[in-house]
Amino acid sequence: MSKSENLYSAARELIPGGVNSPVRAFTGVGGTPLFIERADGAFLYDVDGKAYIDYVGSWGPMVLGHNHPTIRNAVIEAAQRGLSFGAPTEMEVKMAELVTELVPTMDMVRMVNSGTEATMSAIRLARGFTGRDKIIKFEGCYHGHADCLLVKAGSGALTLGQPNSPGVPADFAKHTLTCTYNDLDTVRAAFEQYPQEVACIIVEPVAGNMNCIPPQPDFLPGLRALCDEFGALLIIDEVMTGFRVALAGAQSYYDVVPDLTCLGKIIGGGMPVGAFGGRKDVMEALAPTGPVYQAGTLSGNPIAMAAGFACLTEVAQPGIHETLTDLTAQLANGLLEAAEETGVPLVVNHVGGMFGIFFTDAKTVTCYQDVVKCDVERFKRFFHLMLEEGVYLAPSAFEAGFMSVAHSVEDINKTIDAARKVFAKL
């Protein structure tokens, strides 16, 4: 047995499923998950000494590549002054200044510890601010594992084949209205059914938890218009897309102004950080200035703030997003060419530094219904054969892939060559 297999066997005796987040268990592809010993740049190194070109990037945060020296040194320096104080620090102020500068729609920001905390808190704030209970989300979109959001969710829920999680009371779920991504008619119908009851829409501006689905040109502006018409708030969940699709997020790329924005992943540089923010009048409804309660023992802790500040400072440097976008486009185009050469039907969606691979005869993949028609069994074979070639992709047909600026053109070409070889075997 390999060392990964031995560790996985031991882990399953102590940790449910052997992992601390379900998709890591390779449930979506079968087999034994890799146990990682270290990572550097664009590469992962497992406990058995094998190296892999990594397109998971810790599920999105590693836009600069793994073990970036600026972030690492910032963490070391901060740790020497103490790990957590439970009191305000100067770095929290600097971080808030930087985030609100980079994302102009955020007048104020509150730091939390995860993307789930960010979306959960933003929805509570929207409900408190509007005095309404219902929310609109989209089929196949994942916004963390808060109870009200685990209704027809994407990501791990799709991987497990469970659109709704047991343990979510029907009384909670009844306030969540689910519409079709990229279909404004379903959203208008929901509003017209409950014209005075919808507090907010929450949406991934690029759906990254049913693989990678960009919005149609009229979709996000249409959501903004509907929120204005019916007096609801628009929450854009940029946990995945923030600082990756563009410096100011997908909202700037697609030119839409939300009332609230949720951030995660890149904002922490690899440390557990989330944030939510937006209009000043809405944010001032939060405790202690307002009645909507939200708190966290480790929120804004000095280690995470130091890592996040260092990461965002680097990400804001000129040329970063142009490089990220160019590398992603090179990979996507190369995969499509290799698939065409070998007669494999393939769609590759991409925007900014994220991409999605779909085995399908369809010409486009634009919504949940398109995604679930794709050939999952072929993806499973593709995943394992690519792993043998030293390429680590997301271990699920329903997860997006992530590029970093640490990837080289040589890494991209090696990946395309590996895919060409693998496509010929499918």
Swiss-Prot record:
Keyword flag Cytoplasm: yes
InterPro entries reported in the protein's UniProt record: 4pyrrol_synth_GluAld_NH2Trfase, Aminotrans_3, Aminotrans_3_PPA_site, PyrdxlP-dep_Trfase, PyrdxlP-dep_Trfase_major, PyrdxlP-dep_Trfase_small
Top-level class of the enzyme under EC nomenclature: isomerase
PTM annotation (N6-(pyridoxal phosphate)lysine): residues: K265
Catalytic activity: (S)-4-amino-5-oxopentanoate = 5-aminolevulinate
Record EC number: 5.4.3.8
Disulfide bonds: none
NCBIfam families recorded: hemL, PRK00062.1
HAMAP family: HemL_aminotrans_3
Protein name per the record: Glutamate-1-semialdehyde 2,1-aminomutase
The species this protein was found in: Enterobacter sp. (strain 638)
